[in-house]
Structures are given as structure tokens and as C-alpha cells.
Design a protein with these regions (language model features):
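Surface-exposed, charge/polar-rich loops and edge strands
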Residues: 115-117, 123, 136
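Conserved small/polar residues in nucleotide/adenosyl-binding loops
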Residues: 158-164
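Charged helix-capping and loop-helix junction motifs
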Residues: 91-93, 122-130
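Alpha-helix-loop-beta-strand connector modules within alpha/beta enzyme cores
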Residues: 127-139
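Short acidic, glycine-rich surface-loop motifs adjacent to enzyme active sites
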Residues: 105-115
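Long, charged amphipathic helices and adjacent flexible linkers at domain junctions
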Residues: 27, 31-51
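Histidine/lysine/aspartate-rich catalytic loop segments that bind and position anionic ligands
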Residues: 51-102, 106
Length: 166
């Protein structure tokens, strides 16, 4: 809930609404940090669940790079691009610079569709293919490209983009 939404509740002014938002955010961060330490990021569903609440209600498209070690444990993540309500731009070069700087063995790309529909666009498919090909050359595997929709929907693009994996 936002400060303005909380202020609509009788008896909650701006100061109290800000306090409540701060408490909610702190609780979310603590819970996420504890969960992060136990997660195996080799599973698309696990990754989608981990990022779902942060991404599904965003009004603009965000592309997140998830960098993993050789045991599929999270090294770090980074928002690589914030676009419009219909798209975002990021270069393959920027993605792999971050991955190499973090010494990632593999990566996962996530982005949200503000429309709530996780169906991939042609551009989503093209970007996935380009990142996959570059990763093969560089030696940093793209494990998945996940599209986050609304209402707990997500779509894994890795099998759509490459029907026959070696």
C-alpha cells in the first residue's frame, strides 16, 4: 500500500502512513534476505516466486539481471533497465559486463509486463536468443528469461526460444 492509500483509512495521517510503509518495507527486506540465503536459483518457478511481488505491480517495464555462482546461488541482482509501460531496452554487452564483473557462472534475466499478460513479444524472443548466443561464446550460460505478469503468472522463455537444447 502507498502512503496516499493508507491515508484514506480513517485515523491515519501522513506521518503514520509513512511509518507503516517503512515497517512494511523493512519486513519485506528482512524476509527476502532470509529467503535468499536458502534458495536454489536453478528452478524458474523458484526465481519467479522470489521476484514476483517486487515486479508484478510495476507500472513500467523493468529488466533485472540475476547473477549466479556455479551452484546456482545468488551472487547479486541488478535492475539493468527501466522502460515504458510497453518496453525496455538493454544491451547484451551491458548484461555480460555486469555478469563478468560479478564472476557469475550463469545468469537469469527477468522482466515484467505491466499489462499483466506474460505472453512474450517478438522482441522478447529476439533478446533471449541474442543473450543465449552471446552467453555461449563468453562462457556465461543464460539459464532462463522469465516474464512476470500479474496475478502470480510467469512465463519461462528459455524453452520457447530454444526448443532443442544441447
Amino acid at each position: 500500500m502507498s502512503v496516499s492509500e493508507l491515508m484514506q483509512i480513517k485515523g491515519i495521517g501522513k506521518a503514520k502512513a509513512v511509518q507503516i510503509c517503512c515497517i512494511l518495507e523493512l519486513s519485506r527486506r528482512i524476509a527476502k534476505q532470509k529467503a535468499r540465503e536458502r534458495l536454489d536459483f536453478s528452478n524458474a518457478e523458484t526465481i519467479a516466486e522470489y521476484y514476483m511481488e517486487d515486479m508484478r505491480h510495476l507500472k513500467r517495464e523493468h529488466l533485472v539481471l540475476v547473477m549466479l555462482d556455479n551452484r546456482c546461488r545468488l551472487i547479486r541482482d541488478k535492475v539493468m533497465s527501466v522502460g515504458t509501460s510497453t518496453g525496455s531496452m538493454v544491451s547484451v554487452r551491458e548484461i555480460f559486463k555486469e555478469a563478468l564483473d560479478s564472476r557469475a557462472a550463469s545468469i537469469v534475466i527477468l522482466h515484467n509486463h505491466p499489462s499483466g499478460n506474460p505472453s512474450p513479444s517478438r522482441e522478447d524472443m529476439k533478446v533471449t536468443k541474442n543473450i543465449m548466443e552471446a552467453g555461449r561464446i563468453i562462457g556465461v550460460e543464460l539459464l532462463d528469461h522469465i516474464v512476470i505478469g500479474d496475478n502470480s503468472y510467469f512465463l519461462s522463455l528459455i524453452h520457447i526460444s530454444e526448443p532443442t537444447r544441447p
